[in-house]
Amino acid sequence: MKITETIHAFKHLFRLAVAENIYVDRTVYSYILLGEKVCLIDAGVRGTAPQLQDYLRQIGRSPAEVFMVPITHAHPDHIGGLPAVRKASPAASFYAHAADKPWIEDVERQYRERPILNFFELVEGPVPVSKELKEGDTLQWAKGKTLRVLETPGHSRGSISLFCEEEGALFAGDAVPAAGAIPIYVDPQASIRSIQKLKKVPGVKHLFSAWHEPISGSQIQTTMDDGLRQIEKIDQIVKDLCKTLPPETSGEELSIRALEKLGIKTGKVLQMVKTSFESHRKKNA
C-alpha cells in the first residue's frame, strides 16, 4: 500500500494459536521506506516473507536492496521474517533496543520465556543485532532523511518508536494499543508514559502502527487518547476485581474475570495476556 512517494505499508496475514488446533486470524504491518536503497521497519512473520519480497519487486525494488532493518520490538510478528531478509540481502543491518536484543538473537529463549503454541510457525530463526538503539539515536535511511529513536517501553521492555521529521512520519510499533483490544504489555504505567510521550512529538502527520492501517490528521491524537483510555479502563477493572477476589487468585482466573468485564468470554488465556493483567495487579498491590 503506497502512503507517500517514499513510504509503503505492507500487511502480513497470519494465524495465532490460542489453544490446540484453535487459531485466530491476525494482521501486522511492516513499513517500507524508499531511498537510494530500502529501509524496512519490522519484518512480519515467517510465512509472509515471499509476499513481502514480491511486493518489493512490484514497486520496482529488489529484496537485495534492503540495507537497514530497525525493529520496533522482538515479538514474533515483528521478527519472524528477519532471516528471510538476511538471506535476500546479506549486507542488511538489524537494529533494536538492548532490552529486546536477547529475544532476537536467541529465539529459543524467547519461546521459553514467552511461550506461544505456534511460535515456530511464526518465527524462522535468530539474526544478529548489528547495533543497539537508544533514545535520541538517529538512522539515516536516505539522503536528507533520518529516523529518530524514541524509547517507548510498555508493550515490551525494549519497545521503540521511530520518527522521521522530514516526512512527519511516526512509526509506533505496538506502543499504542487498540481501543477494545485484549491487552498485550508488560508494564501498563510505562505504556501510559510512552503514549503521552508520543502525543507530544511535534510535526506528526502520519501515525504508522503495527496493528492498524496508517492514520493521518486529527485521527492521530484520537487514536492515542483511545489507547490511553483502554489501559486506564483495564486498570480500573483489575483494581475492582482485586478488592473482591482472594489474594491467592491465579493469574489465569484473574484474566478470565477481567476479560468477561471487557465482554470477552474464554476458557483459556494466553501467557502474554495473563502477563498483562498480572502487571495491573502488581501495580495495584
Could you say what each language-model-derived stretch is?
Residues 46-48, 74-79, 101-103, 157-159, ...:
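Active-site environment of divalent metal-dependent phosphoester hydrolases
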Residues 45-50, 57-139:
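Active-site HxH/HxHxD metal-binding segment of metal-dependent hydrolases
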Residues 88, 190-247:
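Divalent-metal (often Zn2+) His-rich catalytic cores of metallo-beta-lactamase-fold enzymes
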Residues 41-44, 66-74, 94-98, 151-154, ...:
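Active-site neighborhood of phospho(di)ester-bond hydrolases with catalytic His/Asp-centered motifs
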Residues 32, 135-164, 169:
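Core dinuclear metal-dependent hydrolase active-site scaffold
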Residues 2-59, 161-174:
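Conserved beta-strand hairpin/beta-sheet module of binuclear metal-dependent hydrolase folds
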Residues 110-115, 189, 225-226:
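Short, hinge-like loop/turn segments at secondary-structure boundaries
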Residues 237-285:
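C-terminal regulatory/interaction regions
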